[in-house]
Amino acid sequence: MTSNARNGPLPPNPLANSGNNRDISADITMAEQVVRPESQTQVENSSTKQPNGQTKPMSASNAKDPLRPRRKKAKRACFACQRAHLTCGDERPCQRCIKRGIQNSCHDGVRKKAKYLHDAPNEALMPHLQGQLYTQTNAVRNNMSLTSNGSNSKTNFYPRQNSNFNGYYATKNDGSLSQSQLHDAGRPDTFPSQSPVSPTFSITANSATSGNQNMPSSLPASNGNASGQAQNGFGSAFFDPCDPALFNFDLASMNFGNHYGALEFGMLGHMATGAGDTPPSDSATQHGSVGRNGSGTFAPGSNFGESPTAQPSFLFGDPTIAGDWSSSVHTRNIYNQNMNHMSETPHAFAIESGPANFASPNSIESPLLTNSATFDDNTTSAYQNRSSMNPMPPQRQPVVSTPQLKHLQLSKRRQRNPSAIYESVKEPYSYTTGFHSLTAFIQRRFSTQNTLRIAKALASIRPSFIATTKTLNRDDLIFMEKCFQRTLWEYEDFINACGTPTIVCRRTGEIAAVGKEFSILTGWRKEVLLGKEPNLNINTGGSSGSTSGTSSRGSFTPRAGMEVNPSGRTQPVFLAELLDDESVVEFYEDFAKLAFGDSRGSVMTTCKLLKYKTKADTDMLPGNTGGTGGGDGQSAASGNGHVKVENGMAASNGQAQPLSQPQRRWSRGGIAGEAGMNQLGFKDGKVECSYCWTVKRDVFDIPMLIVMNFLPCI
């Protein structure tokens, strides 16, 4: 047996049948190229060339090489790359679509809308194709409308500027847009949703629509010239809320992925930076001026500006007017008359498309109540039959200026000048005298135990006061008082605007400012609290009687007149005079912790405020042992001391007795208005409240003032 037979059959010769093998391998290679995915082809193409001329496929280590060129991240991928989850570029068409031969269909992919963009139309979110279709279609429509009118230059819509936003969007030639695309883009029925209307309308007696010319103009030519001048002077971008050139928006620097987000961000920034820069003028209110005559049609000369002859204009996007029109039955019919024009611009839902006026007049003085911007039942027929509608002669409407209303409300505030504080303060405030007066009052009113607790609390912060004030000279103390008065000047505006009972006192506890709500709640008048009038209060919250005027240390003598300190100033009321004994002790214990502690800290707890009661008030109240209930000298006190006063009769033990003096009406029922607030705590002289207070320091880190807010517990 030979070796070949022993070892088995010989392997096939590689050179044998070389032609057949070559054909089979070629077919396999062609099939692999057809079936092979594009990603594998890209891997083979991304090969590195060796020095000997051979190619070597890129390995995983080379793919992660930090020195390899990185592809720039695109702002938005095209539709094909987005569906294939591949990296795309900013250019259109992208390189991948060019390699695949589908560059003609390369366009931006559709992103998932954010929640706050659900109400926005899809066309406004397309930064490339649809955005330019919107802009260019609107320009073509406006040009066609202007040329069709001929000599009649009066139109309801002002033309907008053709802005392609080259700084942000990829430029596209105008010739690449076919006429069918422009026609389809201008049709409102091709859009899935309608955007809120925000173009500017100029309502004049001889206004003519640009879509149809069924309504003839029959007024003199002088009005037409005036309207034409107004159009030339205020046309294009001035009244267009969707044009970024209106507010000098640089959309490229905002780095937004869509037109809508960039305009919204720019509008918010414009409102935030220019809120206080607009001076109160008549031109600032003309965007919200609406008037109507007796027939239900809008007529000129009925705006609320100071000039009755000014050209009236209004915005459909104005929220103050849209609120009145939202309840109208025929609102949809009115809008449909010019819906073709309204759907052309990529509305960005601008909050304000004109100069904003932040005046907020009272509801009874609002111009929208004096001249209602509503339509009667014949409005629809009047718009449909325009050929039969003749211009009505303008009727003079009452002129109400919003800046004048704003001036009436803020006239008192504008008269205040903080410069007067720096000119009037010439002497430092004597806090030493204030602390001495506080010590004398505490020893006179409180018991020995409570006085000791208050003294310990004040003694704990006394070294800190000495350390912070020992290096201050006279000029520093004067500057400290100026800082206090300047800060108090700001807090007074806050107190007047806030409806919460509020008081502001110095670190000594002397009242420096008070709100009218606090006076209503407690009965303490502002003049009494500030020391401008005598303090005749005898209510100290003692346990021996509700209003007997006694305390734990015996009788408390009220101030017969305005107490004058040795420094020559009147003595304001101390905070300790407004609270009961336990509340005062708790306050000073908390004040010792917060005075030099957390500069931003606050304390929230409960307290009992003392009502302001004089001897005359005590005598007027039936049920008090020292009071008189009627003119016959008999006491009108009931067994439990609960007496209800109604209609000048004191009901005691089921019997009504006439009262000789005016009585305070109080009951355990509901609370309404100032009278109801005044009833709180009138029986026992205490009002249970929850209050929050904080300490504000000056530039020397010394407690300067204490701000306290109260809310009664009802």
UniProtKB/Swiss-Prot annotation:
<feature type="region of interest" description="Disordered">
    <location>
        <begin position="1"/>
        <end position="71"/>
    </location>
</feature>
<comment type="similarity">
    <text>Belongs to the ERT1/acuK family.</text>
</comment>
<feature type="region of interest" description="Disordered">
    <location>
        <begin position="176"/>
        <end position="228"/>
    </location>
</feature>
<keyword id="KW-0539">Nucleus</keyword>
<keyword id="KW-0010">Activator</keyword>
<feature type="region of interest" description="Disordered">
    <location>
        <begin position="274"/>
        <end position="312"/>
    </location>
</feature>
<keyword id="KW-0862">Zinc</keyword>
<feature type="compositionally biased region" description="Polar residues">
    <location>
        <begin position="191"/>
        <end position="228"/>
    </location>
</feature>
<keyword id="KW-0479">Metal-binding</keyword>
<dbReference type="GO" id="GO:0008270">
    <property type="term" value="F:zinc ion binding"/>
</dbReference>
<keyword id="KW-0805">Transcription regulation</keyword>
<dbReference type="InterPro" id="IPR050335">
    <property type="entry name" value="ERT1_acuK_gluconeogen_tf"/>
</dbReference>
<keyword id="KW-0312">Gluconeogenesis</keyword>
<dbReference type="GO" id="GO:0005634">
    <property type="term" value="C:nucleus"/>
</dbReference>
<dbReference type="InterPro" id="IPR056751">
    <property type="entry name" value="PAS_13"/>
</dbReference>
<feature type="compositionally biased region" description="Polar residues">
    <location>
        <begin position="38"/>
        <end position="62"/>
    </location>
</feature>
<feature type="region of interest" description="Disordered">
    <location>
        <begin position="539"/>
        <end position="567"/>
    </location>
</feature>
<feature type="DNA-binding region" description="Zn(2)-C6 fungal-type">
    <location>
        <begin position="78"/>
        <end position="106"/>
    </location>
</feature>
<dbReference type="InterPro" id="IPR001138">
    <property type="entry name" value="Zn2Cys6_DnaBD"/>
</dbReference>
<dbReference type="GO" id="GO:0000977">
    <property type="term" value="F:RNA polymerase II transcription regulatory region sequence-specific DNA binding"/>
</dbReference>
<dbReference type="GO" id="GO:0000981">
    <property type="term" value="F:DNA-binding transcription factor activity, RNA polymerase II-specific"/>
</dbReference>
<protein>
    <recommendedName>
        <fullName>Transcription activator of gluconeogenesis UREG_00958</fullName>
    </recommendedName>
</protein>
<keyword id="KW-0238">DNA-binding</keyword>
<feature type="compositionally biased region" description="Low complexity">
    <location>
        <begin position="545"/>
        <end position="555"/>
    </location>
</feature>
<dbReference type="GO" id="GO:0006094">
    <property type="term" value="P:gluconeogenesis"/>
</dbReference>
<dbReference type="Pfam" id="PF24990">
    <property type="entry name" value="PAS_13"/>
</dbReference>
<comment type="function">
    <text>Transcription factor which regulates nonfermentable carbon utilization. Activator of gluconeogenetic genes.</text>
</comment>
<dbReference type="InterPro" id="IPR036864">
    <property type="entry name" value="Zn2-C6_fun-type_DNA-bd_sf"/>
</dbReference>
<dbReference type="GO" id="GO:0009267">
    <property type="term" value="P:cellular response to starvation"/>
</dbReference>
<keyword id="KW-0804">Transcription</keyword>
